[in-house]
A protein has these predicted regions:
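Conserved GNAT acetyl-CoA-binding A-motif
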Residues: 96, 103-116
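Conserved acetyl-CoA-binding loop of GNAT-fold acetyltransferases
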Residues: 124-134
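Conserved N-terminal entry element of GNAT/NAT acetyltransferase domains
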Residues: 1-11, 152
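Conserved acetyl-CoA-binding loop-helix of GNAT-fold acetyltransferases
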Residues: 82, 88-101
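Acetyl-CoA-dependent GNAT
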Residues: 14-18, 22-72, 78
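C-terminal "cap" of GNAT-fold acetyltransferases
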Residues: 116-117, 136-152
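Residue-level recognition of the GNAT/N-acetyltransferase active site
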Residues: 78, 83, 116
Length: 152
């Protein structure tokens, strides 16, 4: 269940970096929190702030084709990060729901992501399906699976 009184808001790219570094780059070979798609036209960054105005959750939503239906509009979820002390509190689902609403406003047929295996159950519980074999992601060197949700 989500923590009380938290709202998902659009944020600037630079606001994502500290939380991405802390959550997504820990125990990986890189400390760089930037993505090539961060400034791509149409990219949206979402965030949730605590009562002290600290960013405690973030996600990035990029217009990027789903490789198995490249003619359809699709949104790739990247950089989903929830501060360690707020994980399993519902904030990830709040971000996911807001991002899916965003994707629907763009008439996206799919939302997809390269999900870390450590987060795979989260996506499966939230109406994504795993697609294909697992792989080791090049930047983090961590095991991942493609996940996708068909919106219509």
């Amino acid at each position: 269940m989500a923590e009380p009184n938290f709202q998902v808001v659009k944020i600037a790219t630079e606001e994502t970096y500290a939380l991405r570094s802390a959550v997504l780059r820990a125990d990986t070979p890189t400390s760089d929190p930037k993505y090539a798609e961060d400034s791509k036209p149409g990219t949206v960054h979402l965030g949730i702030f605590d009562e002290n105005k600290n960013l405690i959750a973030t996600s990035t939503w990029v217009i990027n084709p789903w490789q198995h239906d490249s003619s359809a509009m699709a949104i790739q979820l990247r950089g989903m990060a929830v501060a360690t002390n707020h994980q399993k509190s519902g904030l990830g689902k709040l971000l996911l729901d807001a991002g899916i609403i965003h994707a629907k406003t763009l008439n996206a047929k799919y939302v997809w992501a390269k999900a870390r295996d450590s987060a795979l159950d989260f996506y499966l519980r939230n109406n994504f399906v795993s697609f294909g074999d697992g792989f080791t992601e090049g930047v983090t060197q961590m095991p991942h699976h493609l996940v996708v949700q068909k919106l219509f």
